[in-house]
Amino acid sequence: MTCPRFSRAARRVGVVGLMLLAGTVRADAPKTAELTPDRAAKADRLRRDLREMITLARDQVFPALANIRVITVRYWGGKEQKGQSVGSGTIISADGHVLTNYHVVRNGEKFKCTLADKQEISAELVGEDPLTDLAVLKLDLSELNAGTGPLKVARLGDSSAVQIGDTVMAMGSPFALSRSVSLGIVSNTERILASSGDEPQEIRFNRDQRTGIFNRWIQHDAAINPGNSGGPLVNLAGEVIGVNTRGMSFGGDMGFAIPSNVAAQVARKLIEKGEVQRSWYGINLKPIKKTGYKEGVLVNSIVSDGPAASAGLQAGDVITHIDGEPVTVWFTEQVPPLLKRLANMPVGSTVVFTYRRGDETREARVVTAKMQKDRGEEAAFRAWGFAGLDITDRMARARRLDSTDGVLVQSVRRGSSADQAEPALQRGDVIRRIDADSISSLKDLIAVYDRTMDLEELPEYLLVAFDRNGRNQITLIKPKPEKEQDPPRELPKAWVGIAVQPVLPKLARKLGEPDHTGFRITRVYPKTLAADADLQVGDIVLALNGDRLIPRGMQDGGLLQRRIRRLDIDGEAALRIARGGEVHDVAVKLERTRITPSEARRDINREFELTVREVTFFDRDENRWDEDVKGVIVDRVEPAGWAQLGGLRAGDLIQRVGAHAVRGLKSYRAAMEQVTEAEPERVVFVVLRGEGTHFQFVEPDWRPAVGEKDKVDSE
């Protein structure tokens, strides 16, 4: 092989560059190919062709993209907690079905989809399948603008034809931003996440809910970021060949997509029946690679009362044939397809397993059962202060419970009736009975809760029987929560309408008066008796009624007012002040202390998840509001509650609710009561924020939440 030759100019450039980088020169560096007009033309055609292919493929799917915004409800801390999540989806039917991930819509209560033409319309959940992490929404086509043409629909391709090295595009709305596309290649068509052993790693959304057990992902390096989940993976033919589900950025972009063949099958079943029915056997399978066997698949574990155990199979058996067809699982990548094949058998069908036990070959005829949910339904019992879960078979087995009867305590709200009971309810307790009512399911507990809270006079206590760690215990719970009280107010005391800061020795020396330590007046509150006295900002208060005031540190910032509070209201105080190097005595009439924001009366609206308080003297002074400015101040908005979703913020001054002017707490409560009774689709809040007014549009969902009927909340 001959060594390539360099031109003299090229050698000079190469030598200088290499010397700068490493101080050495390689004489055998490859020669840069000369860019001839022919090569330049070919490269330009290739770029144009690739750009055209990408553009054509993009335009096949981009119009069918949907940005999904989800209002979620989860149960934690003994109460219902709302939140928001975003994701992407693909319109797959002219009827408005949108394919996305289960984890995008998980715990969803309300769904909004933004289409390619910027229209935002509502959607409802058709069905979800946690085990494959897939879900289907259906757009409310009645909300489309008049004149809108037929929906753009993406075409699902054949994921079995995908090969390593294929060029693909990931589409979606990363970080809830506008639609985007990223380009990459397929790295692996049969990716699973394996544990350190020889079996697939089990992925879970929480302790109870598994996912991805039937999936072998398409791995690619097109960038996936939060918000891309549920979006399509597209080939250069403009076909959806996967649903982007997970992404990793360390070590280069790694994206994982559910193959379109899996997604199409699941979506079809969800649209037809609202669920994916699967057969259950009660076995766990493992590859035989390390077992010494040459064929078959190992029964790694078995559910003692499951269909497989009832047919005679045991842990340690090696299955060699299923319905007469030989089966061998050597690698972990072969486990998900086998599990999928078994699960896809019709529920109730008989499946013949040929297996080896020791030196014997045996046969088991397994009648499949319907695979149940991993995790039960949830509800919060607000007045009692806890959230509960229905118990599924899988949950009972994982917790070693005798049965699925009862309701599992998922969480307890601190300070609630359940928390203050003796003994208190705890996470993991199983409620079996309330007074004379047996509790077999969440439905039973909801019925008892609603019936109890509908009583005109609530009982003082409820007797609750529950199991904890195999022991049956009882406790008493107050069905009526303690009424929330306004913050305690200090008894009226003497006050001077000034704000001050301590003047310590170093500051006094810097001011040129080392002996004048005390309290510098930072504000004289207008419309107070102090404003009528000869007091000015910058005065340093040295003494009160002849007693010298010497602050020891910033912690003594309240010393002056504490001394004043010891005096009689409506009396008079003599303040010795330093001003311009001279000392003066100023007589100030005392008045009553003003209510602070922390002492202000409050109103908690549980429907809108909004807390407001009355306007205080100090609020008016801080915001420079005169007496004509009326309303109530937003003290707190719960995350993702109706108020927060409508744009209300802490610090807003609510001046109008709908058609009702708000002048204080009384008129605010009356306005909110009328709104709650009328249940309008939209409630307009007019608020003063900063220097201007803002109109905030709140869209309540007036449908009652399961287990949330609570009459005492408004008391």
Name each region found by the language model.
Residues T2-G14:
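Bacterial N-terminal signal peptides that target proteins for export
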Residues R12-A22:
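Bacterial N-terminal signal peptides
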Residues D28-A315, H321-T350, R356-R394, T404, ...:
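Serine-dependent protease modules
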Residues G316, G428, G538, G651:
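Conserved catalytic motifs of ABC-family nucleotide-binding domains
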Residues L389-R399, S403-G415, L610-L645, A650-I654:
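C-terminal accessory/binding modules appended to enzymatic or scaffolding proteins
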Residues I439, L445-A447, N623-D626, D635-V683, ...:
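C-terminal soluble interaction/assembly domains
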Residues Q696-E715:
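Short, low-complexity, Pro/Ser/Thr/Gly-rich segments in the mature regions of secreted, periplasmic
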